[in-house]
Amino acid sequence: MKPFPRAEISSSALQNNLAVLRQQASRSQVMAVVKANGYGHGLLNVANCLHTADGFGLARLEEALELRAGGVKARLLLLEGFFRSTDLPLLVAHDIDTVVHHESQIEMLEQATLSKPVTVWLKVDSGMHRLGVTPEQFTQVYARLMACDNVAKPIHLMTHFACADEPENHYTQVQMQTFNQLTADLPGFRTLANSAGALYWPKSQGDWIRPGIALYGVSPVTGDCGANHGLIPAMNLVSRLIAVRDHKAGQPVGYGCYWTAKQDTRLGVVAIGYGDGYPRNAPEGTPVWVNGRRVPIVGRVSMDMLTVDLGADATDLVGDEALLWGAALPVEEVAEHIGTIAYELVTKLTPRVAVCLA
């Protein structure tokens, strides 16, 4: 019997999305970003499905070590860099690249005793003002890294966009100009583009693109949908009806009697809730896909269940599947109803949700 709830992950969708991004940025190599457990899709599952990617981007060393232990041989890059001096021998032993963005990391590299140099991607703060060396610091920092025997040469260069998911916002052009002026004529790879950069800002594509959310079939732009770019949702979040009940006009449902029926109807109870990562704040009207149609959530989402209005003439049965998001119901649409972003929905699923390749 199939587990419920479950996240069905489509290997063919992941491979399609990688192909779409390669076509979009045909001159660039692809560093598939698989941090946060492959955006909730399963770290090793995703990496194996995307084995033709040129490299993988991760947030934490533990993620990179898991991929190496799972047999992944491709280039790995720690997008936040290393945090402790004791991380450096592990980077060397497992051939893992690191971002450098802070003085403390440079000091650790200068003081370390390593068997071979570490491959470094120097992050430039071109305007996001979160991580990276400022334009004023760049020349001095670059010179220090060049002088450091523990840093492999050439040094690679990167930045990150603040507003690339706003196609009408020209701040991305400002960031590109800042980065390109600073790094002109320097050797090494350059990477600027995230998913939004790859899809909307072709001049940002550089030697490598770093797509994340688009690999999973989701558009990075609010109000857009991955299907508009030929992307296919890689996750179907599925549960089932565990009760179907006749419900009278004037009767409330759920904690706090938050919703009251205006007319006689039939309600379905779906076995998923905030204990599984489905947001408690999903408002009335948030869609769920049941037997080929959208039905609205009514009442409050509870820990293990949510309730939907199936309609007065519904013929749905206990055991019928309910799709919370996926191919028939884009996660972007669900996120818009809830007032969040698709990134948050797919990455917040809890271990109670079985993740399985479909």
Curated annotation (Swiss-Prot):
One MF annotation (Gene Ontology) recorded for this entry: alanine racemase activity
Enzyme category, top tier: isomerase
Swiss-Prot/TrEMBL cofactor(s): pyridoxal 5'-phosphate
Keyword tags: Isomerase, Pyridoxal phosphate
Gene3D superfamilies xref list: Alanine racemase, Lyase, Ornithine Decarboxylase, Chain A, domain 1
Binding site residues for substrate: 130, 303
Pathway membership: Amino-acid biosynthesis; D-alanine biosynthesis; D-alanine from L-alanine: step 1/1
Reaction(s) catalysed by this chain's protein: L-alanine = D-alanine
Signal peptide: none
Pfam families named in the record: Ala_racemase_C (PF00842), Ala_racemase_N (PF01168)
EC number(s) given by UniProt: 5.1.1.1
PROSITE patterns: ALANINE_RACEMASE
Post-translational modification N6-(pyridoxal phosphate)lysine, affected residues: 35
Gene Ontology cellular-component annotations: cytosol
Alphabetized HAMAP family for the sequence: Ala_racemase (MF_01201)
The protein's name in its UniProt record: Alanine racemase
Source organism per UniProt: Shewanella sp. (strain ANA-3)
Classification of source organism: Bacteria, Pseudomonadati, Pseudomonadota, Gammaproteobacteria, Alteromonadales
Name of encoding gene: alr
